[in-house]
Design a protein with these regions (language model features):
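Compositionally biased, disordered extreme N-termini, encompassing classical targeting presequences
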Residues: 1-2, 30, 76-86
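Local sequence-structure signature of Cys/Sec-based thiol-disulfide redox active-site neighborhoods
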Residues: 1-19
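Immediate flanking context of iron-sulfur cluster ligation sites
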Residues: 2-5, 33, 44
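Auxiliary Fe-S-binding modules of radical SAM enzymes
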Residues: 12, 43-45
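Conserved helix-turn-beta segment immediately C-terminal to the redox Cys motif
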Residues: 19-32
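Thiol-based oxidoreductase modules, predominantly thioredoxin-like and allied folds used
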Residues: 29-41
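Structural micro-motif
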Residues: 46-54
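Non-catalytic, surface beta->alpha helical segment in thiol-disulfide oxidoreductase systems
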Residues: 57-83
Length: 86
């Protein structure tokens, strides 16, 4: 599973990355987190406000920091599609 954090490196972007890393660790999910700071790449996802979280190339949230439970739900949705598990 590939999780991308889109943003300029601002405090909210760093917070989203930290929260996402924490959720992954607690869930025990095999995932890679990538930071995307290039504005053209960010706009390529249709994101106009950061931070944003993209899981397996699907934008899940942008313009805010989702809570841990919300991030967990996004990961579970994609894990089910990818591996057939929750």
């Amino acid at each position: 599973m590939i999780i991308k954090i889109l943003g300029s490196g601002c405090a909210n972007c760093k917070r989203l990355q930290a929260v996402t890393e924490e959720v992954i660790k607690v869930m025990g999910v095999d995932a890679t987190i990538e930071k995307v700071e290039d504005i053209k790449m960010i706009m390529g996802y249709g994101v106009m406000r950061t931070p944003a979280i993209v899981i397996n190339e699907k934008v899940k949230a942008f313009g805010r920091i989702p809570g841990k439970d919300e991030i967990k739900k996004y990961i579970q949705e994609e894990a089910k599609k990818e591996w057939g598990v929750v």
